[in-house]
Amino acid sequence: WYLENLTDEASRKIWEFFQGIEKEGGIVKALKAGSIQKKVNATAAKRYELADQRRQSIVGVNQYVNLAEKKLEAPEGSCCSAHKGHGCCKNADIQLPEVEMSVDSACKAAGEGFSTCLINKALVAGVDCKCGEPLEMEALPKRRLAERFESLLAKADAWVEEKGSRPMVFFANMGPLRQHKARADFSRDFLRAGGLDVVYPSGFQTPEDAARAAAESGCAVCVICSTDDTYPEIVPAFCKALRETRPDMMVALAGYPADYVEAFKEAGVDIFIHVKANCYNTVEAIQNKIGL
């Protein structure tokens, strides 16, 4: 039943959308007016927001990133390699004449082996709207949901290629495993969305010991990992000890204890890693601090 209900709901929304286009005078007028572009851009912005907050998962990109994964190369002759000047079909090097604006003519060209990019180029060249005036409208950009996070990963990969090692973040894990593991594991996965790896030590007994290890790690950023009820005792002492030797080090806190956020900022916490945080913005800020 639920599938039928969702299908009915989707079909009604789609039909409403088509009726809106017809009210504007058809697809061409709607595109020229920019109403379709506006709706598409609004949807894209919302989806980017969900992905940035990891409320929409992109496995391997903003969730469950495998830093050891090797980048695939596009095989010769694929559509991806066509952008580099290689053929993606048997007639890629042939100049296709103007194609009439009809489904039949486009299908015929495709059946003869012409690529979609050549067919599109020929269609555009032949468009005159039957009135002698060229069509002018706002173009919809090519975009993918994963591209923002892929840009972060690309910067980290470039760092690895230049430095020979992955950019690292130090984890100030406090107390026994049960005290820090949940937030440390979450923060590690969070940071991997930007291609960052972590120094993951056993739990420290005192904030001073953790601050000393963080300062000596050589990392530009550290993350305090513990529980909300222990943070009031740990955070001020850790920040004070760290500032004595590494005042330039960025301090992140795993979690967001609302009652203490302002106090912890005053103590020296720069950024918070938590489930409601904007992952893209947070990781980008950490990358910038590291120097990517």
Per-region residue spans from a language model:
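Domain-level signal for soluble alpha/beta catalytic cores
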Residues: W1-L292
